[in-house]
Amino acid sequence: MIYIFLANGFEEVEALATVDVLRRADLKVKIVGVGSDVITGTHGISTVCDVVDSDLTPGDDIEAVILPGGMPGTLNLERSAKVNAFVDYAYENQKLVCAICAAPSILGHKGMLKGKKAVCFPGFESELEGAELSDSFVVTDGNIITAKGMGSAVKFGIAIGAAFVGEAKMKKIEESLQCS
């Protein structure tokens, strides 16, 4: 299962474009609300989640954990013990850990980016502790995928999807979305 965590103040396009792209690839994605099943994004758009974080426990079904950015959404994700437990489990078990915009800062604070190439929203670079910063819109380094921000959300989803279904299938999806 691919888990994407939403906390109040998340960046709507980063979250929902990513989910859309992954579901077009027939991947199982569960939208997890932090503290509630209805989460409001930074631009006032409310999203009904598939499940509330309190109903979940990290385990073997984790294939990937995705953290969208946005403020204060990123801060709210980082404060969540459940989000941290899922991120830690995924990282320790070599599953995908994916973060976009400000959210790579969470991985930086955990030391997960040391020696890895990574990217984030401009202004958060100092939070990516030990990372080799990139100018790319999306960066994959081992089991970590990071992306710059809202404008790279579709490419972020494409990169995550490629890890599961291959680049050829994701290229077709990208073309169908008029992104290539």
Where are the language model's segments positioned?
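Beta-strand-turn-beta hairpins that frame and shape the catalytic cleft
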Residues: V139-I144
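Short, thiol/selenol-centered motifs that function as redox-active sites or metal-ligating centers
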Residues: I100-C101
